[in-house]
């Protein structure tokens, strides 16, 4: 948390995404979308975000000069919400940090999603989401907005369920953006370093570094579909359908155990 002092008072606000509430996260996501569309600038984003966190009725730049000066001098305290890089022409690029393992929109407008770190997601839906994520990258490269929107909705429907399965409305765009960001964030965590499960650090990179570095199709029997059949053949979780219905963390842990034992045996033979 960070403390902001202005107008002879002090207020404490979150310093990064992992400290925000669900309501604060939704506002941050809305501002991120507006900035991405070019509706607001990075500077306006920071002003609006700080004003919101402080509970102000308007942007603080609408207040007295003294307050503007005080808060302008403390804006660096919001740096935990943004990453800063340098562009090809030397310009500063500001990017909102949306990476978190917390599902900050688990309950939204009648929709209920999986838990933090994708807890509750089945292995089948996990594989489907990875395939859809790859398709979205291709659609983005082709600037195919309609396909991107369709893929985002498909990913959301893998992670979230509507309260009335007989009357499922269109997926809210904000929820769809969140679902893709959330899934991508957890997957990046799996690929980039140890993940803590039950207090133990598990480094899944031994499983997926090669898989992630190669452009494999999901149905080529050497990628995820092939893995499903291999696990089903072991009989640990049952047949293919039962493997698909198994929590994906359970399957990943099983694969990790198998790979770890294989590497251990390989070292002992040397």
Task: Give, region by region, the residue ranges found by the protein language model.
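An amphipathic, hydrophobic-aromatic interaction surface with interspersed Lys/Arg
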Residues: 1-270
């Amino acid at each position: 948390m960070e403390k902001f002092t202005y107008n002879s008072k002090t207020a404490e606000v979150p310093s990064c995404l992992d400290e925000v509430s669900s309501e604060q996260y939704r506002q941050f996501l809305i501002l991120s979308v507006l900035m991405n569309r070019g509706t607001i600038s990075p500077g306006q984003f920071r002003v609006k975000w700080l004003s919101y966190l402080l509970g102000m009725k308007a942007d603080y730049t609408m207040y007295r000069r003294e307050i503007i000066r005080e808060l302008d001098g403390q804006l660096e305290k919001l740096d935990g919400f943004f990453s800063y890089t340098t562009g090809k022409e030397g310009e500063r690029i500001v990017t909102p940090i949306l990476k978190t393992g917390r599902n900050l929109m688990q309950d939204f407008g009648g929709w209920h999603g999986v838990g933090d770190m994708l807890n509750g997601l089945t292995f089948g839906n996990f594989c489907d989401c990875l395939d859809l994520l790859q398709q979205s990258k291709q659609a983005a490269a082709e600037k195919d907005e309609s396909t991107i929107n369709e893929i985002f909705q498909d990913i959301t429907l893998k992670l979230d369920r509507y309260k009335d399965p007989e009357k499922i409305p269109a997926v809210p765009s904000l929820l769809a953006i969140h679902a893709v960001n959330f899934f991508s964030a957890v997957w990046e965590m799996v690929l980039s370093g140890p993940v803590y499960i039950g207090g133990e650090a598990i480094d899944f990179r031994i499983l997926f570094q090669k898989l992630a570095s190669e452009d494999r199709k999901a149905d080529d029997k050497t990628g995820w579909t092939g893995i499903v059949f291999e696990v089903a053949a072991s009989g640990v979780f049952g047949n293919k359908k039962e493997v698909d219905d198994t929590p994906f963390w359970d399957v990943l842990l099983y694969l990790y155990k198998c790979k770890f034992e294989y590497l251990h045996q390989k070292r002992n033979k040397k």
